[in-house]
Amino acid sequence: MTNLRKTHPLMKIVNSSFIDLPAPSNISSWWNFGSLLGVCLIIQILTGLFLAMHYTSDTMTAFSSVTHICRDVNYGWLIRYLHANGASMFFICLFLHVGRGLYYGSYMYLETWNIGVLLLFAVMATAFMGYVLPWGQMSFWGATVITNLLSAIPYIGSDLVEWIWGGFSVDKATLTRFFAFHFILPFIIAALAGVHLLFLHETGSNNPSGLCSDADKIPFHPYYTIKDILGVLLLILTLTSLVLFSPDLLGDPDNYMPANPLNTPPHIKPEWYFLFAYAILRSIPNKLGGVLALALSILILAVVPFLHTSKQRSMMFRPFSQCLFWILVADLLTLTWIGGQPVEHPFIIIGQLASILYFLLILVIMPITSLFENNLLKW
């Protein structure tokens, strides 16, 4: 008799995705982040659900309801900080996951990669709207500044902004709709993640060497299930340490002041995971130019597969490309630092140089270096 897990209509889907799935025998811990992102999403949906039970999306009571959650709800402080810091862990895993894809040439699976770029946009939109909900000073002014960027779109800009606001400023209508979208988007993200996996399992995983691994596959369970569980334990250890020892480490003190439209904070800045894009936005003195650069800083990922000029897929055996990759990482860290600094000398020029280098590396320097490496190998 055939095993039930191979015949049952529901169980055979799970079986072919997580148990009997043929996986390359040499994938490293950099391949753990997909499953960690799944765990992050589950944590965010669960903690978010419990927060939504006590939160009120009204400008008069939003701030108080968050205070009430932290003070009066059983373990409300824990749920709130798990959710806030869970977002940071989510983005750390996301950036490492994307970095892995860039380093090992996983972007050659076009459908999987494009769904991934779409997922990145969806997660960023969700995080932005979630940051507005506590209705602190940074929530309000962050929402005002970022939504106002859309007014740079020619002809329809100002109408579009008022349509998103639901009025002539960020107010009750804005908060209510942001809460509604913040609630529904994670479920859309979960569905997209399913499609992401579906496309991945059409081709199978890439591996560090970038070579075809059909000749050497091992079953996903028990090898990679155990490996993933180790990753999950480390993720939970990091998250709980952050939540229990320094829950406000990554937050902004300004957000502990209720939103006040009459008082602008001295430095308006988003959460740390948006700072690199924010720095690129600020480095261009023109409003429309800044908005375009902001959008392109993420959209550029969709262009990467078409800029792959190397005869090798992975960077594992390409030392020059490796150097450039780590320069790109250092550049992104520099942009993240600049995004959190005030707009004054020398931060302005550093931000502008780092922004130029970011686009130059991806669009020009890395493709040319790949051609040079092909030449060295007489390919």
Curated annotation (Swiss-Prot):
Keywords: Electron transport, Heme, Iron, Membrane, Metal-binding, Mitochondrion, Mitochondrion inner membrane, Respiratory chain, Transmembrane, Transmembrane helix, Transport, Ubiquinone
Cellular component annotations (GO), alphabetically ordered: mitochondrial inner membrane; respiratory chain complex III
Annotated transmembrane regions: 33-53, 77-98, 113-133, 178-198, 226-246, 288-308, 320-340, 347-367
Cofactor(s) essential for the protein: heme b
Cofactor note: Binds 2 heme b groups non-covalently.
UniProt-recorded Gene Ontology molecular function terms: metal ion binding; ubiquinol-cytochrome-c reductase activity
Alphabetized InterPro entries for the sequence: Cyt_b/b6_C, Cyt_b/b6_C_sf, Cyt_b/b6_N, Cytb/b6-like_sf, Cytochrome_b, Cytochrome_b_C_euk/bac, Cytochrome_b_N_euk/bac, Di-haem_cyt_TM
Outcome of substituting residue 295 to V: In strain: Isolate IZEA-2887, Isolate IZEA-3303, Isolate IZEA-3383, Isolate IZEA-IZEA-5326, Isolate IZEA-5339, Isolate IZEA-5381, Isolate IZEA-5561, Isolate IZEA-6137, Isolate JS3032, Isolate JZ665, Isolate JZ835, Isolate San Rhemy and Isolate SI-91.4
Taxonomy, superkingdom: Eukaryota
BP terms from Gene Ontology: mitochondrial electron transport, ubiquinol to cytochrome c
Amino-acid positions noted as binding heme b b562 in the UniProt annotation, renumbered to this chain: 83, 182
Assembly, per entry: The cytochrome bc1 complex contains 11 subunits: 3 respiratory subunits (MT-CYB, CYC1 and UQCRFS1), 2 core proteins (UQCRC1 and UQCRC2) and 6 low-molecular weight proteins (UQCRH/QCR6, UQCRB/QCR7, UQCRQ/QCR8, UQCR10/QCR9, UQCR11/QCR10 and a cleavage product of UQCRFS1). This cytochrome bc1 complex then forms a dimer.
Family that this chain belongs to: Belongs to the cytochrome b family.
Name of this protein: Cytochrome b
Lineage: Eukaryota, Metazoa, Chordata, Craniata, Vertebrata
Gene giving rise to this polypeptide: MT-CYB
